[in-house]
Amino acid sequence: MKTAIYPGSFNPFHNGHLNILKKAILLFDKVYVVVSKNINKSLDPDLQSRVKNIKNLIRDFNNVEIIINENKLTTTIAKELNASFIIRGLRSQTDFEYEIKYYDGFKSLYPNIEVIYFISDYDKRSLSSTILREIEFYKK
């Protein structure tokens, strides 16, 4: 069985993330969406709220499971779930340069893992959780 994890803070999980997930489920038997804390980003809303949001968006997906990662490395989660693949999304060349560092880190910690990159569809590339949080903040 081909198993992958799709890790992220998903704060919030938006249509760009959903676009990548829809592509991933076509290739993998099982995809775990791993909702994690990000020490470099705000933790509001809490992990449970983020999971609830994602569940509402993926309720019709049969081969997707959501798990919370409170304090483990992505590669540790992959090993625990017997996942051989990590899913990542790319929107731009800047993302690619950023992701090379993650790739190197993943491979140094778990040499057998493969990182699979999906390019966001054109109409989803401008979406950013950081921008969406900022818009929501200033709407108040």
Swiss-Prot record:
Q: State the UniProt keywords alphabetically.
A: ATP-binding, Coenzyme A biosynthesis, Cytoplasm, Magnesium, Nucleotide-binding, Nucleotidyltransferase, Transferase
* Known cofactor(s): Mg(2+)
Please, which domain of life does this record's source organism belong to?
A: Bacteria
**Pfam families from the xrefs?**
CTP_transf_like (PF01467)
SUPFAM superfamilies per the UniProt record, alphabetical? Nucleotidylyl transferase
**By its UniProt entry, which InterPro entries does this protein fall under?**
Cyt_trans-like (IPR004821), PPAT (IPR001980), Rossmann-like_a/b/a_fold (IPR014729)
Give the positions of the site Transition state stabilizer: H17
Where is it mostly found? cytoplasm
Residues reported in the UniProt entry to bind ATP: S9, F10, H17, G89, L90, R91, E99, K124, R125, S126, L127, S128, S129, T130
State where the protein is found.
Cytoplasm
Known EC number: 2.7.7.3
Where substrate is bound, by residue? Answer: S9, K41, T74, R88
* GO cellular component assignments: cytoplasm
Instruction: Quickly give the catalysed reaction.
Output: (R)-4'-phosphopantetheine + ATP + H(+) = 3'-dephospho-CoA + diphosphate
A Gene Ontology biological process noted in the UniProt record is: coenzyme A biosynthetic process
Q: What does this protein do?
A: Reversibly transfers an adenylyl group from ATP to 4'-phosphopantetheine, yielding dephospho-CoA (dPCoA) and pyrophosphate.
Describe, as the record does, how this protein assembles with itself and its partners: Homohexamer.
Q: Which PANTHER family match?
A: PHOSPHOPANTETHEINE ADENYLYLTRANSFERASE
Protein name according to UniProt: Phosphopantetheine adenylyltransferase
- Species the sequence originates in: Mycoplasma mycoides subsp. mycoides SC (strain CCUG 32753 / NCTC 10114 / PG1)
Q: Species lineage, top-down? A: Bacteria, Bacillati, Mycoplasmatota, Mollicutes, Mycoplasmataceae
